[in-house]
Regions:
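N-terminal small-domain helix-loop-helix segment of the aminotransferase-like
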Residues: 2-103, 110, 294, 402
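PLP-dependent enzyme catalytic core of the Aspartate aminotransferase-like
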Residues: 346-350, 356-366, 370-402
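Short strand-turn motif at the edge of the Rossmann-like AdoMet-binding core
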Residues: 211-213, 242-243
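Conserved core of the PLP fold type I
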Residues: 67-199, 215-216, 221-232
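PLP-dependent aminotransferase class I/II
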Residues: 236-320, 326-330
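Conserved PLP-binding catalytic core of the aspartate aminotransferase-like
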Residues: 307-308, 321-360, 377
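Hydrophobic residues in well-ordered beta-strands that form the structural core
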Residues: 124, 145, 209, 365-367
Length: 402
C-alpha cells in the first residue's frame, strides 16, 4: 500500500479522548491491570494517520499569518461537488444546495426544528446511534423506535410493516435515517431505500438522513445516496455529510448538508444561522479541500481495503473462538456490534462483567446498551491489524473463556 495503515502511533498527550479521556471520572473505568496497555476500540475515530494532503493544506494556509473573518471559497464547494460525483455518482449538485454545519448532529436538530414542533414524535431505527438519542431528547423531541430485524442470513433489515404502524399510530412526519447504519454497519440496498421512501411519501414523512459514514463502505458493497432514489426523495430529504469520519477530522469540526428543495433549504439555513454559532473554521475549510482530492480518494480506497481486512479477521476470529457471541459482519463503517446474549447465558455472566473483563486487560470497548443493544458491545476496528489481533488474543485468553 502507498499509505500507512500499519504504524502504531502513540496518541497519548495529544488531546485525543480515545486515549487521554480514559481516566476515572472521564470516559472509562479504572485503568487496565498492570502489564496491559490500552487498545482504543470505543469512540468512533481512527488510529491511522490521515492523508498527507490534509496536513499539507493546513500547513500551507498557516504560513499566511492572518486568521480573521473570511468567506467560504469556491474551492470548498467545488471539492464537495466533485467528491460527491466521483464517490457517490451524484449529478446536478450546485453550490447553492450545500450548507455548512458544525456537526451532523447539529444539522439534524436544525432540520428537525424546521420540520417539527417540540414534543413531536420522530421515527428512528433501533439499535440507535447514541448521538441521536441524546440530541433529540435534549431538544424536546420524542423518539419512536422501529427495531431492525434479522433475516434468515442474520442480516439486519428494516421492518416496513412496523415502520408504517409506528408512523400512523404516532402521527409521525419526520424520521432520522442512518445510512450506512451505525452501529449495525448495514449498507442499505436500493430496493430497501426505495421501499422506505415509498412509505415516507405515502404518509408525508420528511427525512433527515445522516450519511457521514458513506465513504467507509467495505469491499463488495456500494453506498446509494438517499436523495438519488427518486425525485420525491430528492425534495423530501435533508442529507448530512462530513469529511470528519472518513479522514479522522472530528477535532477540526466541519460538516455540511445537501438540500435540493429550495424552500426547505432556506428554512434550514436560517435555523442553522440563528445563534451565529454555526460558522465554518478557516482551517476546516482548507482541510476539506485537501481531503476531497484524487489523493484523498486513493487514500480512502486503501482505508476501505484495510478496514475490510480487519473486519474479516475479527469476524472470523469470533466465529472460531467465541461460541455464543453473535455479530453481523458489517458492510460499512469500522464498527462491530457484538451480541453477547447467548455467551452470557451459557456462562452465567452479565454484560457488565464481560465489559469490565475487557477493560481490565486494556481492550477499551463500548457499552452497547447506549445503542439499544441490551447485551451488546460496540467495537472500533480502525486500528492497525496488529493491534486488532492483540485485542482479540486478550479477549480469548482473559474474557471469553470457559
Amino acid at each position: 500500500m502507498k499509505y500507512d495503515f500499519t504504524s502504531i502511533i502513540d496518541r497519548h498527550g495529544k488531546d485525543a479522548i480515545a486515549v487521554d479521556g480514559l481516566v476515572p471520572g472521564g470516559h472509562g473505568p479504572q485503568p487496565p491491570k498492570e502489564g496491559f496497555d490500552i487498545i482504543p476500540m470505543w469512540v468512533a475515530d481512527m488510529n491511522f494517520p490521515t492523508v498527507p494532503t490534509i496536513t499539507q493544506a493546513i500547513a500551507q494556509r498557516i504560513q499566511h499569518p492572518f486568521f480573521g473573518y473570511f468567506a467560504t471559497s469556491d474551492d470548498y464547494y467545488n471539492a464537495i461537488i466533485h467528491w460527491q460525483e466521483q464517490r457517490n455518482g451524484v449529478t446536478g449538485l450546485t453550490k447553492e444546495c450545500i450548507g455548512y454545519e458544525n456537526g451532523v448532529l447539529g444539522g439534524v436538530i436544525s432540520a428537525l426544528n424546521v420540520l417539527c414542533s417540540k414534543g413531536d414524535n420522530v421515527l428512528l431505527h433501533s439499535p440507535t446511534y447514541i448521538g441521536f438519542t441524546g440530541c433529540l431528547t435534549n431538544n424536546g423531541y420524542h423518539i419512536v423506535h422501529s427495531p431492525l430485524v434479522k433475516d434468515e442470513a442474520g442480516i439486519y433489515r428494516m421492518d416496513f410493516a412496523d415502520m408504517e404502524k409506528k408512523i400512523v399510530e404516532n402521527s409521525i412526519h419526520a424520521t432520522v435515517f442512518c445510512s450506512p447504519h451505525n452501529p449495525c454497519g448495514r449498507v442499505w440496498e436500493r430496493w430497501e431505500l426505495e421501499k422506505a421512501m415509498e412509505l415516507f411519501q405515502k404518509h408525508d414523512v420528511m427525512v433527515v438522513c445522516d450519511e457521514i459514514w458513506s465513504d467507509i463502505i467495505l469491499e463488495g458493497h456500494k453506498h446509494i445516496p438517499m436523495q438519488s432514489i427518486s425525485e420525491d426523495a430528492r425534495q423530501r430529504t435533508v442529507a448530512l455529510y462530513a469529511p470528519s469520519k472518513t479522514f479522522n477530522l472530528a477535532g477540526l469540526i466541519g460538516s455540511y448538508h445537501i438540500i435540493y428543495n429550495k424552500a426547505l433549504r432556506d428554512r434550514v439555513d436560517k435555523e442553522s444561522s440563528l445563534s451565529h454559532y454555526n460558522s465554518l473554521n478557516v482551517l476546516s475549510m482548507h482541510a476539506l479541500v485537501g481531503a476531497y482530492t484524487q489523493e484523498g480518494s486513493d487514500w480512502v480506497d486503501e482505508l476501505r481495503q484495510t478496514i475490510t481486512g480487519n473486519v474479516d479477521y475479527a469476524c472470523g476470529f469470533i466465529a472460531q473462538h467465541f461460541p455464543g457471541v453473535k455479530v453481523q459482519k458489517p458492510q460499512g463503517t469500522y464498527m462491530l456490534f457484538l451480541d453477547c446474549t447467548e455467551w452470557c447465558e451459557a456462562h452465567g455472566k452479565t454484560i457488565d462483567q464481560v465489559q469490565q473483563a475487557g477493560w481490565d486487560v486494556g481492550v477499551a470497548w463500548q457499552d452497547g446498551r447506549a445503542f439499544h443493544g441490551p447485551c451488546h458491545i460496540r467495537m472500533n476496528l480502525a486500528l492497525p491489524l496488529s493491534r486488532v489481533q492483540e485485542a482479540f488474543d486478550r479477549l480469548q485468553k482473559y474474557v471469553f473463556v470457559d
